[in-house]
């Protein structure tokens, strides 16, 4: 919205800064973090009052969780989502289709997560929204988003998969790209959801991934930088850097309250929304495969669950002491803070590897 002030630069020369994505990204970070700082305590108090017993804690999980996490309210994703939306509406170019597509996915996945959290809290059970129904709705939302991005993009590129390390290698999937793109978005949403099991564990890697994709969006949406780095230029995606900035700001504000011992949990409301958002930005910028590197921690968490389930069904034995894998390390004797900080370090390393693919071609 504030981007339109740049049109008044002849009268107010200082307003020219609103043209620049970098300036507006910084504004989005500051706006989102201040919003969450200001309204976070009130949201937490309201959720604690409404939820009573808070998020149900897994009885088969680490016993320390039953003591330290019991009674903590969930749906903290509402704080992140609110800060993200306010900052994006203020600082992004609202005539940009990609902005609205990403917000559509974020809102849709957030609503699914909210309903799932609501069922878990009211029933005081981990049996929330039906898994099949949830995946079906997520796939529908993601599919619509991918179709919109294909129609908005450049023919021959928007329906293609780009490969890191190869500057000219494109695999055009045609309309099958809708299935591929929807899978990326849904997988990202649920992978982040599985990662959100310890205080601060998910939000920091999400911010790291957002910072990485903020740079990727800016570079991919700038014809000069895209040509220099020999990555695929996608007109308009640079504006998604503003949304990435809003994620970082809202995430920093949320982490203030989610740092151990957490005053609030993100819940599916936040984790599904943020994962879907990252997935949709990856699809928009043509960096779907790079997402698997930058978000490798989320992939690891998701794969650990898949391996555990398949192994138990086929052999009756578990590969890990507990899945997702962060609980496995807790069972091995790592403290919660050790797991969280070490996983943060992994997220940083993977993000650097992912960003390196922009230059190594």
From Swiss-Prot:
Pathway where this protein functions: Cell wall biogenesis; peptidoglycan biosynthesis
Record EC number: 2.7.8.13
Subcellular location field: Cell inner membrane
A molecular-function term among this protein's GO annotations: UDP-N-acetylmuramoyl-L-alanyl-D-glutamyl-meso-2,6-diaminopimelyl-D-alanyl-D-alanine:undecaprenyl-phosphate transferase activity
Keywords: Cell cycle, Cell division, Cell inner membrane, Cell membrane, Cell shape, Cell wall biogenesis/degradation, Magnesium, Membrane, Metal-binding, Peptidoglycan synthesis, Transferase, Transmembrane, Transmembrane helix
Reaction(s) the record says it catalyses: UDP-N-acetyl-alpha-D-muramoyl-L-alanyl-gamma-D-glutamyl-meso-2,6-diaminopimeloyl-D-alanyl-D-alanine + di-trans,octa-cis-undecaprenyl phosphate = di-trans,octa-cis-undecaprenyl diphospho-N-acetyl-alpha-D-muramoyl-L-alanyl-D-glutamyl-meso-2,6-diaminopimeloyl-D-alanyl-D-alanine + UMP
Membrane topology: Multi-pass membrane protein
NCBIfam families: mraY
Functional note: Catalyzes the initial step of the lipid cycle reactions in the biosynthesis of the cell wall peptidoglycan: transfers peptidoglycan precursor phospho-MurNAc-pentapeptide from UDP-MurNAc-pentapeptide onto the lipid carrier undecaprenyl phosphate, yielding undecaprenyl-pyrophosphoryl-MurNAc-pentapeptide, known as lipid I.
Protein known as: Phospho-N-acetylmuramoyl-pentapeptide-transferase
Organism name: Azorhizobium caulinodans (strain ATCC 43989 / DSM 5975 / JCM 20966 / LMG 6465 / NBRC 14845 / NCIMB 13405 / ORS 571)
Upper classification of the organism: Bacteria, Pseudomonadati, Pseudomonadota, Alphaproteobacteria, Hyphomicrobiales
């Amino acid at each position: 919205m504030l981007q339109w002030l740049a049109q008044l630069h002849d009268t107010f020369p200082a307003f020219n800064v609103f043209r620049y994505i970098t300036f507006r990204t910084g504004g989005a970070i500051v706006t989102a973090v201040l919003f969450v700082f200001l309204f976070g305590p009130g949201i937490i108090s309201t959720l604690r009052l409404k939820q009573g017993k808070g998020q149900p804690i897994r009885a088969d999980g680490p016993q320390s969780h039953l003591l330290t996490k019991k009674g903590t309210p969930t749906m903290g994703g509402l704080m992140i989502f609110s800060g993200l939306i306010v900052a994006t509406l203020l600082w992004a170019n609202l005539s940009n289709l990609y902005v609205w597509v990403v917000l559509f996915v974020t809102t849709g996945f957030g609503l699914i997560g909210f309903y799932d959290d609501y069922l878990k809290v009211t029933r005081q059970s981990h049996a929330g929204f039906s898994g099949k129904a949830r995946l079906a709705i997520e796939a529908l939302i993601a599919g619509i988003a991918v179709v919109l991005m294909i129609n908005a993009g450049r023919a021959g590129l928007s329906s293609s998969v780009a490969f890191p390390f190869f500057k000219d290698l494109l695999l055009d999937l045609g309309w099958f790209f809708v299935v591929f793109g929807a899978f990326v978005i849904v997988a990202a949403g649920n992978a982040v959801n599985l990662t959100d099991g310890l205080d601060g564990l998910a939000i920091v890697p999400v911010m790291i991934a957002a910072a990485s994709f903020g740079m990727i969006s800016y570079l991919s949406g700038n014809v000069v930088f895209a040509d220099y780095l020999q990555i695929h230029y996608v007109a308009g995606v640079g504006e998604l850097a503003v949304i990435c900035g809003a994620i970082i700001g809202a995430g920093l504000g949320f982490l203030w309250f989610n740092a151990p011992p957490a005053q609030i949990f993100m819940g599916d409301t936040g984790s599904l929304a943020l994962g879907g958002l990252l997935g949709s930005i990856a699809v928009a910028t043509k960096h779907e495969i790079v997402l698997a590197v930058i978000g490798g921690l989320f992939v690891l968490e998701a794969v650990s669950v898949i391996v555990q389930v398949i192994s138990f069904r086929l052999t009756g034995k578990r590969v890990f002491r507990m899945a997702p894998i962060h609980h496995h390390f807790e069972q091995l004797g790592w403290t919660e803070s050790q797991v969280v900080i070490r996983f943060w370090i992994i997220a940083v390393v993977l993000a650097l590897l992912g960003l390196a693919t922009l230059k190594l071609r």
